[in-house]
């Protein structure tokens, strides 16, 4: 296929798609140019069905530093593991694409997005999402798209689609919404305490804008789209399914209704093992035993799936016996740990998170050097999910995509209520340790984070709580669930996380397993989430009503002084010699910004005070008219040099020593003598002249005798 180009304008910027020139061996490939951002997307599919029990979709978002005219950092000067932003963007693209493949599709699919040029005012992630959908849509991969996504901002009561960098910085909302022509299927948002009505309107505005992008994709597919390949879907043997359902459905139904998680898991596992043992023995000599046992496992999963959904939609019974809008039992604790700067333990049913606060000097901020201009990040929220939290063994190592994503969601929810750096000049790190999990652990980490911040004396604007909403839908009827647990998340159609204060929403995240959800479902879910959020805030505020007025004794204290910008080099010294000497003497940490703000951190107030004295002395300047208690340091024929303070000296000229004539300076002064002097002049080179006689009353002039005349 020869190169073909398609052009439109979207949100005020040119959107150009090129097909047929590059990556022609992929199943589908596009080059998307949005503004001056360029993203190459290639989609490929394996020829055979994978053996696992899940759909192996991999989406990558690769940031090439040359795209922004930068050299990669580090010794190797080569791109390494994806940045946090790249990982989050890959997840952002994966989530709306995944539901658009058929049930039972098991061929491995990879969608690789490579940023070739970067324009900070034209969203490369949105170009990559568009390119991912289009590459799949024009390929022979059986993808039920297209989908598209947009960013939505909110400034002065107006919604802005795909805002530029300056607009996003001024926006009260940072929303990414994706979906198909029919419905929304992915949401990711941070917001400055906006109401449910505004958030819902933003979602609908975003979905409206998506229609334009989907129509553009459909035009392109009509011209260059390939015929979809016929692939084998995972389908179980119908006779085998009927046999197992008839024999064991009643037993499995009973097991599913056991309320306690571990007991329920044991009961369902016992039924499954009994079924597997029977059929493994029955077909032991069959050459297709592996396929049969795979079908048995899939049938049992489908039976459990169907029963959980039936109980909720028909009987209005949840696996743990709760009502549809009921929250699990809550518990909140502060000061769980000694010595640390703040800690909070939050428990919701069988989900429990411990959050630990650490405060540090601003020098500890994280430097982010990606495609965007380098910046410093002063608030970090890290989320850890050890396998023991679900009673299992597993891999331990660096944080995976899920942990990075959950940490970022908590960070987005909490950063909206943090004080400004002017009010609270600290780097803040929260670490959430999930100790138990039965669903909604990311939201538990937000609640625990609020407790830790308030216990640690961080003056947040308001406490934040989070809740996860679920959905069971048969296409016609639906049920929205409050505070979903693991089983409801696994077998349900939606995981809709909502975090916020009493004033409004600070973060949203929605993932679904169906093609999309309607505005009515969104509105109902937001309303139920608000009610639940207020219930959780009641528990948090009963534990700790407001941030403590003081930091923990172990937290670094801070004091700030202002110096002239031209004195920064004096405090730092050649090669950092002066500031290193101060730190070595006092044991403090010192940060100096480009505007001359000097922040001094230490748990010892005396050390802070001593450091302030030293710095004040270093930057102190002599002023004309001021009097100093000086020390004579050198004597010359023409006068004496005196030290006013620290490294500032002055010349007392011989004529400025006394009102009477001084013949020899050494007759009047000696080295080491203390004298009071007044500064009388500072020249353009900074040289200081001082006077001793200016502090002495001038003697009266002698009266002239009258001459007698003869």
From Swiss-Prot:
Any single biological process term in GO: RNA processing
Domain S1 motif: 625-693
Record bears the keyword Magnesium: yes
Species the sequence originates in: Streptococcus pyogenes serotype M18 (strain MGAS8232)
Taxonomic lineage from the root: Bacteria, Bacillati, Bacillota, Bacilli, Lactobacillales
A cellular-component GO term for this protein: cytosol
Function comment: Involved in mRNA degradation. Catalyzes the phosphorolysis of single-stranded polyribonucleotides processively in the 3'- to 5'-direction.
SMART domains assigned: KH, S1
Residue ranges, annotated region (Disordered): 691-710
Entry keyword set: Cytoplasm, Magnesium, Metal-binding, Nucleotidyltransferase, RNA-binding, Transferase
Protein name per its UniProtKB record: Polyribonucleotide nucleotidyltransferase
Annotated binding of Mg(2+), by residue: 489, 495
Keyword rRNA-binding in record: no
Subcellular location: Cytoplasm
Positions of the KH domain: 556-615
Cofactors: Mg(2+)
CDD domains: KH-I_PNPase, RNase_PH_PNPase_1, RNase_PH_PNPase_2
An annotated Gene Ontology molecular function: magnesium ion binding
């Amino acid at each position: 296929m020869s190169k073909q180009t398609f052009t439109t304008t979207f949100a005020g910027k040119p959107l150009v798609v090129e097909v047929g020139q590059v990556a022609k061996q992929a199943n589908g490939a596009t080059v998307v140019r949005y503004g001056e951002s360029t993203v190459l997307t290639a989609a490929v599919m394996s020829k055979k069905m994978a053996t696992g029990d899940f759909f192996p979709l991999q989406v990558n978002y690769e940031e090439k530093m040359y795209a922004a005219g930068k050299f990669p950092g580090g010794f190797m000067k080569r791109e390494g593991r994806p940045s946090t932003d790249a990982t989050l963007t890959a997840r952002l693209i994966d989530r709306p694409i995944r539901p658009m493949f058929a049930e039972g599709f098991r061929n491995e699919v990879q969608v690789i997005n490579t940023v070739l040029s970067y324009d900070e005012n034209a969203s490369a992630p949105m170009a990559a999402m568009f390119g991912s959908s289009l590459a799949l849509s024009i390929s022979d991969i059986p993808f039920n798209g297209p989908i598209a996504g947009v960013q939505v901002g909110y400034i002065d009561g107006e919604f802005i689609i795909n805002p530029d960098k300056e607009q996003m910085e001024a926006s009260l909302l940072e929303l990414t919404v994706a979906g198909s022509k029919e419905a929304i299927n992915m949401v990711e948002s941070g917001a400055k305490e906006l109401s449910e009505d505004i958030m819902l309107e933003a979602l609908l505005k975003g979905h409206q804008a998506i229609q334009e992008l989907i129509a553009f994709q459909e035009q392109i597919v009509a011209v260059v789209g390939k015929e979809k390949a016929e692939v084998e879907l995972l389908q179980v043997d119908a006779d085998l399914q009927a046999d197992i359902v008839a024999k064991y459905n009643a037993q499995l139904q009973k097991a599913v209704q056991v309320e306690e998680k571990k007991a329920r898991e044991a009961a369902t596992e016992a039924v499954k093992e009994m079924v597997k043992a029977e059929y493994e023995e029955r077909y032991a000599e069959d050459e297709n035993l592996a396929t049969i046992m795979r079908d048995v496992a899939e049938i049992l999963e489908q039976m459990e799936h169907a029963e959980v959904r039936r109980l909720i939609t028909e009987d209005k019974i949840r696996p743990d016996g709760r009502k549809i809008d009921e929250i699990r039992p809550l518990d909140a604790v502060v000061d769980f740990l000694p010595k640390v700067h703040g800690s909070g333990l939050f428990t919701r049913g069988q989900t429990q998170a411990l959050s630990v606060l650490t405060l540090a000097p601003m020098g500890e901020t994280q430097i982010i050097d990606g495609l965007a201009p380098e910046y410093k990040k002063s608030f970090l929220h890290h989320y850890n999910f050890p396998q023991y939290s679900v009673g299992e063994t597993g891999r331990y190592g660096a944080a995976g995509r899920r942990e990075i994503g959950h940490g970022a969601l908590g960070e987005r929810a909490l950063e909206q209520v943090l004080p400004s750096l002017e009010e609270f000049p600290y780097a803040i790190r929260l670490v959430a340790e999930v100790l138990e999990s039965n669903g909604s652990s990311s939201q538990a980490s937000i609640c625990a984070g609020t407790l830790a911040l308030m216990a640690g004396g961080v003056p947040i604007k308001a406490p934040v709580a989070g809740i996860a909403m679920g959905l069971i839908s048969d296409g016609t009827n639906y049920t929205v669930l409050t505070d979903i647990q693991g089983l409801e998340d696994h077998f349900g159609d939606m995981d809709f996380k909502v975090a916020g204060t009493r004033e409004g929403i600070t973060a949203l995240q929605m993932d679904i397993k169906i093609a999309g959800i309607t505005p009515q479902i969104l509105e109902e879910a937001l309303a139920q989430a608000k009610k639940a959020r207020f219930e959780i805030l009641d528990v948090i505020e009963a534990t700790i009503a407001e941030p403590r007025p003081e930091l923990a004794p172990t937290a670094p204290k801070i004091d700030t002084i202002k110096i002239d910008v031209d004195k920064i080099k004096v405090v730092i010294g050649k090669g950092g010699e002066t500031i290193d000497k101060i730190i070595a003497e006092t044991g403090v940490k010192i940060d100096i910004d480009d505007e001359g703000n000097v922040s001094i951190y230490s748990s010892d107030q005396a050390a802070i005070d001593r450091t302030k004295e030293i710095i004040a002395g270093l930057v102190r300047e002599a002023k004309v008219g001021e009097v100093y208690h000086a020390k004579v340091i050198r004597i010359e024929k023409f006068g004496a040099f005196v030290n006013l303070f620290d490294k500032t000296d002055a010349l007392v000229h011989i004529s400025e020593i006394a009102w009477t004539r001084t013949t020899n300076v050494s007759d009047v002064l000696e080295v080491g003598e203390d004298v009071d002097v007044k500064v009388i002049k500072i020249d353009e080179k900074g040289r200081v002249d001082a006077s001793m006689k200016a502090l002495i009353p001038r003697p009266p002039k002698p009266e002239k005798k009258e001459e007698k005349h003869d």
